[in-house]
């Protein structure tokens, strides 16, 4: 493994975490949105990011990549709101499955991971610079 590979690995992790942050922002922004389809209103379905190993050719090591962005399988919420025009005959509306607390926790974790990879890049750069000055 070359020391320069660390830039590719940390960089791929930063790109993946950046995309995860975008999905989290989208979930939070759309949590109260509805979609009108086939004559019905449907709540926004939260998205989740699926990571996978992004190996270099002929190598067992590598970075990370987003293999898919999937719909969150958790159930929709039922909220009692009989005055809502979208309520069913029992007075319930179907609401998004976005959990703002979970999204904020995921946001903090993704941001910390991004910051940690920045530190990895800084450390690798520092090591390379020190290596270059050894011969002086």
From Swiss-Prot:
Spell out the PANTHER family in the cross-references. FLAGELLAR BASAL-BODY ROD PROTEIN FLGC (PTHR30435:SF2), FLAGELLAR PROTEIN (PTHR30435)
Family stated for the protein in its record: Belongs to the flagella basal body rod proteins family.
Q: What is its main location?
A: other
Where does the record place it? Answer: Bacterial flagellum basal body
Which InterPro entries would you find in this protein's record? Flag_bb_rod_N, Flagellar_basal_body_rod_CS, Flg_bb/hook_C_dom, FlgC
Q: Which Pfam families match?
A: Flg_bb_rod (PF00460), Flg_bbr_C (PF06429)
UniProt keywords (A-Z) are: Bacterial flagellum
Report the protein name in the record. Answer: Flagellar basal-body rod protein FlgC
Assembly and partners are described as: The basal body constitutes a major portion of the flagellar organelle and consists of four rings (L,P,S, and M) mounted on a central rod. The rod consists of about 26 subunits of FlgG in the distal portion, and FlgB, FlgC and FlgF are thought to build up the proximal portion of the rod with about 6 subunits each.
GO:BP terms for this protein? bacterial-type flagellum-dependent swarming motility
Q: Which GO terms describe its cellular component?
A: bacterial-type flagellum basal body, rod
Transmembrane helix as UniProt keyword: no
